[in-house]
């Protein structure tokens, strides 16, 4: 068995419009589906409804997705995990133009936690020393999740 790609990351949201603006307009993901779905909550509970927006990056049969899930039957609970705590505390996307993405984020009022400073070596990617450096920035999405943007320089 081999892993071909990441299938999807599902993000529970309270404000779909604001979250959609972040992942579509700032990060640059493409909306492929926006629908209301019924889903099972467990054997003892009635089915519930959610609004699910699928945003794709990459092409081909192994594209990856962010799925924004908004519970429509009850109020969404929970909070984002602080950076570097146990659990998935951030995820990252490769972007073509980090400065443009940061400008879009700031213009839309999103929180830039660490902003695109100096480039660092790419050894952390398992590449040989002297590989193409990477610039990174850390943003917070509308739910408080940390989202990193990386650009090769």
Give the label of every model feature segment.
Residues 2-7:
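Extreme N-terminal starter segment of soluble prokaryotic enzymes
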Residues 8, 65-67:
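Structural preference for beta-strand elements that scaffold enzyme active sites
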Residues 10, 30-41, 114-120, 126, ...:
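Conserved catalytic-core motifs of GNAT/GCN5-like acyltransferases
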Residues 11-63, 100, 107:
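Core segments of cupin and vicinal oxygen chelate
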Residues 14-17, 63, 70-143:
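Vicinal oxygen chelate
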Residues 55-60, 137-142, 152:
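Active-site beta-strand termini and strand-to-loop segments that position acidic
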Residues 74, 150-153:
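Short beta-strand-to-coil "C-cap" segments at the C-terminal boundary of structured domains/repeats
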């Amino acid at each position: 068995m081999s892993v071909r790609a990441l299938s999807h990351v599902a993000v529970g949201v309270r404000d779909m419009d604001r979250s959609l603006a972040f992942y579509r307009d700032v990060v640059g993901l493409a909306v492929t589906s926006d629908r209301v779905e019924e889903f099972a909550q467990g054997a003892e509970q009635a089915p519930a409804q959610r609004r699910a927006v699928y945003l794709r990056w990459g092409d081909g049969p192994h594209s990856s997705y962010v799925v924004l899930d908004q519970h429509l039957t009850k109020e969404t609970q929970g909070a984002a995990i602080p950076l570097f705590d146990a659990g998935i505390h951030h995820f990252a996307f490769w972007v073509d133009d980090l400065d443009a993405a940061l400008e879009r984020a700031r213009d839309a009022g999103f929180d830039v936690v660490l902003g695109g400073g100096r480039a660092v070596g790419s050894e952390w990617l398992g590449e040989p020393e002297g590989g193409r450096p990477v610039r990174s920035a850390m943003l917070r999405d509308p739910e408080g999740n940390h989202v990193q943007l990386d650009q090769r320089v």
